[in-house]
């Protein structure tokens, strides 16, 4: 079947479809040169002839042409470039006729024999690894079927070899892989024998890139055409020469490594190797020059060379690490590596320039086939002599001799040669630094060595500063990283790189912190060898200065990195370096040639170095830190001291500042500071005294005062004018508190005096269980009894049966005394549920159990309330006393535990939860069984609740449960009208403080009729008590109450109340004299009393709605309020309590006016008119 090739776009490779054999329609460069080189037209006859020649049948299918298109389309990376380089030519459509492939003649050509011989030698060479290099198969035999050797997918055979492609692989590829495995095994064996050597250094990258570039150029230069065709014969010879040169260099490197291992004096042997390598380079120099000329010639040869260079750059990305085995041998013996010759070091320096620049360019190359033209534009600037030349970096593997000749040429030339050599060095070192910075995988030892080399020359500050001032940087070096971080392998023992301070600072941010630090021993070594470095850098080597041999230096821009030879041994003193080098040169046969080569290569660098050293004397030295700080110190306000160690120039420059210095110009002297401290201390004391006076002038005892003696002393110490001032502007606060003061009702030390949760036992109550649950509870302990109760056993047991009284009483006591509030709430829930279930049994003749007055009194008494506080009134006492409560409880709960624990308090704080639970249960009992308590008992319970509400700790707790119980108790009183005056008089006696009495009035609920009545009557009783009026019977009618209220309101004038209090106080005083402070206190009490009385007046008048008949009484009350109370109050900013009383007056007056407006006027009057008082 005939295969047709689709035309491909220019600049893009044509790859075969997956799963198909590679196309055989690669057009020959010779026949399509016009189409690829430019837009030239070709005749149809030439095109047809080229197609026919291309598809001629081959002589033998088993043998392939060397590097023929049949093995093309090897893809590298993501750019999909092929080895053959023919993808840049446009592909033409093949003839529709079936053509036969031209066979290769069966006899072997001399080129193939030469390459086969190289492969055999390559197999014998165990020192170099070829594993990373793509193999070109040249054998006539194939591997056995089923051999698992990896071959990249891009190595496609021709269509005729499709049957053999699935079963065979190249024997040379297999051989190279075996060589790679043997070399790795040898390296592992050497690593075991040299286990004592811990320091591993990497092979110089110059050797790596040199070998890889040579091998690439040799392979890329091989012809892709038939050997019988004349246009490509010269290129076959050139590729063969390159291959032979590569084999020769491999042999030389192998000999050099063996000599380094076996011989201690490697200096002479290394020089011999360098001479041999230079002779080999001169041997192949004409062919390289002929190849360079082909780059300039336009046409077919130029285009093919460009393609070959392009492919050589493509291969360098995969073959850059090829000769690592050679480096591994050198790393095995780091002690002998220290004795390397200067020739090999300089050679590796030159070799590491352009290959690394090419590698950096390849690493930055964008992916994609359309970027292939950009590789040709990458050039290297070389200036041997005065001629500038652009050269493609792809041909760098053959330029080793050019580098050496370019380095030797300036030795016989003038200053222009030095300038051009420095420029080329700048360009190459720039590429090298950029490449090194882009490789983070470099070994740590190599980075440390480069950093040490840069740090050894950091002390030459004057030389580097002069170089930075007069150097002209090229545009190519504008983006180059610092030299401190460019790890150029210069073997650290013979050459060093002076690096500027700015570059070192810039490189420190890019290098790791661990690599940039130096040890203390290394710093000591730098201090010792500083003199040696300066002597060698000035040109004192081999017995004399180098600058004198080559004439005076010219002022040209110095190189960015100057390669300066230094002392071979870092431990040797500086004065012995020239003699040692002379003795080493005399003992070797090739020392003179080595010196000439050293002088020729670094002639330009030495001249620029000489120029820097000569100009160093004229440069002004940098000022030290002390001098700079002295200048800044002198520019500040003048001081008495002088900065130490001032130079003459600095003293002359700063004479203007020091001339005006005079002592005693400090703004903050010692005397001034002491005076300021004394003033500050005096002001602080005065501020404290004023604050104390302000506190004393307010009339409130200061918390700082301890006794009256201290206060009198403080008052005596004040001036009269100060006393008047404080008295005039003192502000009295909290004269009328918002909350009642309350009383201490509960004594927690007496809590648990009768029983507690540990002494209460249901088995001691005389209860006999009948059901299974009752028996279970009786058999259980005290803790288990509480547990069964809270888990609902009692609720289920007495759901349909009456609960015995001992169980209910035990639950009531346990609820009041249990310290856990959650358990107390659960017991309350159980007790209320059982009580409600017992009330539903209507057929039962027995009322449900409710706690008696003695049970309630015993519970509150056990909480810590004194018996007298429970029943404070002498005329209203219960039928039992305190001893009865204690004896009754002891009879029900007997045992040693009760006697032992009776003296231990069970509560440390107010048991508000237990109190509220008892009140809640009492509220349930009074609502279920209203007739459970007698009127007397109800009155005692009401008085008990009122007394308990005066507890100080209950002021912030809403007593809603108390009010609910009070409503039930007032409702259950049978003879209400008879009991109201008695109840009011009893509540009036519960406290003597007016504000506490007002609290008791406000506790009475006003949302019931009995509650409002009790409030009105109680308010009138308390008003009469506070006004020292004789007790009279309180009228029940509301009209009479309002009329009585008008009489009381006239006596509520604050001034009248104050007079009464003053008279009463004078009667108590023996001398009958009242001072101003006491008078102020009495005034506060008078207004406080007025405030309480006005609240009680409001409770009387605003408790319920009034009829139209009471309208005239409210009109009289409003007039009396304004005339006697409001007009008597004189407001003052210092006396806030007056304003508070007047505000209450305004509110009461507003309420009364609302009542007046709501009441209808009397019959026959449309409007009310003011009638003056008679």
Swiss-Prot record:
Residues 212-221, 266-278, 584-593 have a biased composition (Low complexity). Residues 636-1174 are annotated as: Interaction with SIMC1. GO terms for biological process: DNA damage response; DNA repair; positive regulation of double-strand break repair; positive regulation of maintenance of mitotic sister chromatid cohesion; positive regulation of protein-containing complex assembly; protein localization to site of double-strand break. Residues 665-1167 are annotated as: NSE6-like domain. The keyword DNA damage applies. Plays a role in the DNA damage response (DDR) pathway by regulating postreplication repair of UV-damaged DNA and genomic stability maintenance. The SLF1-SLF2 complex acts to link RAD18 with the SMC5-SMC6 complex at replication-coupled interstrand cross-links (ICL) and DNA double-strand breaks (DSBs) sites on chromatin during DNA repair in response to stalled replication forks. Promotes the recruitment of the SMC5-SMC6 complex to DNA lesions. May play a role in SMC5-SMC6 complex recruitment for viral restriction. This is SMC5-SMC6 complex localization factor protein 2. It comes from Pongo abelii (Sumatran orangutan). The lineage of its organism: Eukaryota, Metazoa, Chordata, Craniata, Vertebrata.
């Amino acid at each position: 079947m005939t295969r047709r090739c689709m035309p491909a776009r220019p600049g893009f490779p044509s790859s075969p479809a997956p799963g198909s054999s590679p196309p055989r329609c690669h057009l020959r460069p010779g026949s399509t040169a016009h189409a690829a080189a430019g837009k030239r037209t070709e005749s149809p006859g030439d095109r047809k002839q080229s197609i026919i020649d291309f598809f001629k049948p081959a002589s033998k299918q088993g043998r392939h042409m060397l590097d023929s298109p049949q093995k093309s389309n090897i893809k590298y990376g993501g750019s999909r470039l092929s080895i053959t380089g023919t993808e840049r030519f446009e592909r033409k459509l093949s003839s529709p006729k079936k053509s036969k492939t031209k066979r290769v003649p069966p006899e072997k050509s001399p080129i193939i024999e030469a390459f086969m011989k190289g492969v055999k030698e390559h197999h014998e060479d165990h020192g170099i690894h070829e594993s990373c290099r793509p193999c070109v198969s040249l054998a006539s035999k194939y591997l056995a079927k089923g051999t698992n050797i990896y071959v990249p997918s891009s190595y496609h055979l021709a269509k005729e070899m499709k049957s053999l492609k699935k079963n065979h692989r190249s024997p040379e590829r297999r051989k190279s892989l075996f060589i790679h495995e043997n070399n790795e095994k040898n390296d592992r064996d050497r690593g075991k024998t040299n286990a004592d050597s811990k320091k591993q250094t990497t092979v110089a990258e110059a050797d790596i890139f040199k070998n890889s570039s040579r091998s690439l150029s040799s392979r890329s230069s091989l012809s892709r055409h038939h050997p019988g065709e004349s246009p490509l014969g010269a290129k076959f010879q050139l590729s063969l020469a390159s291959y032979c040169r590569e084999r020769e260099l491999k042999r030389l490197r192998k000999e050099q490594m063996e000599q380094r291992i076996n011989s201690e004096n490697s200096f002479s042997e290394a020089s011999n190797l360098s001479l041999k390598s230079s002779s080999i380079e001169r041997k192949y120099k004409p062919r390289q020059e002929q190849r360079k000329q082909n780059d300039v010639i336009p046409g077919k040869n130029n285009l093919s060379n460009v393609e070959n260079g392009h492919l050589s750059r493509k291969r360098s990305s995969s073959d850059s690490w090829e000769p690592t085995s050679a480096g591994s041998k050198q790393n095995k013996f780091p002690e002998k590596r220290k004795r390397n010759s200067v020739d090999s070091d300089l050679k590796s320096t030159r070799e590491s320039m352009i290959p690394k620049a090419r590698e950096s360019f390849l690493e930055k190359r964008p992916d994609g086939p359309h970027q292939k033209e950009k590789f040709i534009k990458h050039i290297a600037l070389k200036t041997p002599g005065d001629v500038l030349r652009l050269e493609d970096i792809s041909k760098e593997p053959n330029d080793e001799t050019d580098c050496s000749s370019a380095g030797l040429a300036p030795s016989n030339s003038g200053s222009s040669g030095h300038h051009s050599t420095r420029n080329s060095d700048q360009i190459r070192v720039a590429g090298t630094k950029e490449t090194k910075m882009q490789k983070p995988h470099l070994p740590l030892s190599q980075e440390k060595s480069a950093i040490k080399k840069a740090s050894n020359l950091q002390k030459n500050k004057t030389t580097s500063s002069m170089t930075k001032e007069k150097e002209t940087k090229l545009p190519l070096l504008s983006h180059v990283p610092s030299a401190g971080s460019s790890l150029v392998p210069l073997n650290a023992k013979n050459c060093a790189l002076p690096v500027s301070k700015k570059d070192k600072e810039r490189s420190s941010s890019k290098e790791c912190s661990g690599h940039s630090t130096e040890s203390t021993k290394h710093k000591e070594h730098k201090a010792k060898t500083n003199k040696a470095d300066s002597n060698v850098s000035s040109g004192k080597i081999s017995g004399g200065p180098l600058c004198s041999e080559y004439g005076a230096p010219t002022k040209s821009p110095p190189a960015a990195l100057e390669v300066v030879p230094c002392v071979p041994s870092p431990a040797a003193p500086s004065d012995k370096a020239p003699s040692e080098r002379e003795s080493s040169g005399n003992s070797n046969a090739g020392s003179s040639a080595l010196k000439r080569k050293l002088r020729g290569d670094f002639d330009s660098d030495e001249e620029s170095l000489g120029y820097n050293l000569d100009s160093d004397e004229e440069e002004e030295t940098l000022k030290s830190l002390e001098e700079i700080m002295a200048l800044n110190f002198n520019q500040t306000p003048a001081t008495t001291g002088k900065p130490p160690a001032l130079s003459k120039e600095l003293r002359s420059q700063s004479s203007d500042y020091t001339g005006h210095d005079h002592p005693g110009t400090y703004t903050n002297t010692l005397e001034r500071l002491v005076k300021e401290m004394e003033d500050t201390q005096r002001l602080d004391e005065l501020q404290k005294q004023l604050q104390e006076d302000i506190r004393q002038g307010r009339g409130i005892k200061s918390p700082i005062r301890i006794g009256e003696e201290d206060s009198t002393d403080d008052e005596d110490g004040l001036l009269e004018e100060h006393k008047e001032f404080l008295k005039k502007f003192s502000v009295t606060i909290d004269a009328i508190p918002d909350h009642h003061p309350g009383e201490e009702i509960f004594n927690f030390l007496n809590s648990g005096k009768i029983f507690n949760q540990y002494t209460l036992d249901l088995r001691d109550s005389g209860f006999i269980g009948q059901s299974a649950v009752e028996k279970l509870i009786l058999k259980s302990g005290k803790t288990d009894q509480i547990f069964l109760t809270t888990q609902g056993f009692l609720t289920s047991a007495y759901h349909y049966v009456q609960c015995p009284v001992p169980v209910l009483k035990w639950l009531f006591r346990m609820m009041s005394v249990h310290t856990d509030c959650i358990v107390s709430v659960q017991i309350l829930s159980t007790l209320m549920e059982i009580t409600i279930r017992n009330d539903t049994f209507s057929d039962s003749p027995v009322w449900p159990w409710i706690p008696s007055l003695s049970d309630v009194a015993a519970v509150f008494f056990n909480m810590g309330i004194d018996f007298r506080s429970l029943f404070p009134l002498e005329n209203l006492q219960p039928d039992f006393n305190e001893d009865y409560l204690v004896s009754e409880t002891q009879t029900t709960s007997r045992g040693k535990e009760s006697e032992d624990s009776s003296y231990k308090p069970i509560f440390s704080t107010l048991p508000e939860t237990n109190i509220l639970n008892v009140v809640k249960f009492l509220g349930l009992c009074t609502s279920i069984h209203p007739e459970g308590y007698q009127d007397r008992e109800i009155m005692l319970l009401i008085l008990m609740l009122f007394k308990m509400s005066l507890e100080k700790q209950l002021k912030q707790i809403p007593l809603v449960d108390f009010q609910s119980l009070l409503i039930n108790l007032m409702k259950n009183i049978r003879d209400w009208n008879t009991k109201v005056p008695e109840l009011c008089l009893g509540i009036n006696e519960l406290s003597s403080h007016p504000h506490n009495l007002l609290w008791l009035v406000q506790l009475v609920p006003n949302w019931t009729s009995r509650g409002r009545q009790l409030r009105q009557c109680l308010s009138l009783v308390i008003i009469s008590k506070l006004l020292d009026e004789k007790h009279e019977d309180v009228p029940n009618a509301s009209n009479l109450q309002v009329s009585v209220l008008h009489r009381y309101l006239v006596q509520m004038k604050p001034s009248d109340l104050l007079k009464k209090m003053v008279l009463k106080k004078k009667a108590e005083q023996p001398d009958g004299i009242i001072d101003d402070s006491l008078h102020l206190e009495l005034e506060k009490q008078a207004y406080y009393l007025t405030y309480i009385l006005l609240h009680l007046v409001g409770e009387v008048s605003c408790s319920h709605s009034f009829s139209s008949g009471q309208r005239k009484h409210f009109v009289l009350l409003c007039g009396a309020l304004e005339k006697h109370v409001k007009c008597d109050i004189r407001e003052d900013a210092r006396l806030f309590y007056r304003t508070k009383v007047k505000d209450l007056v305004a509110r009461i007056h507003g309420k009364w006016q609302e009542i007046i407006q709501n009441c209808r006027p009397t019959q026959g009057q449309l409007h009310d008119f003011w009638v003056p008082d008679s």
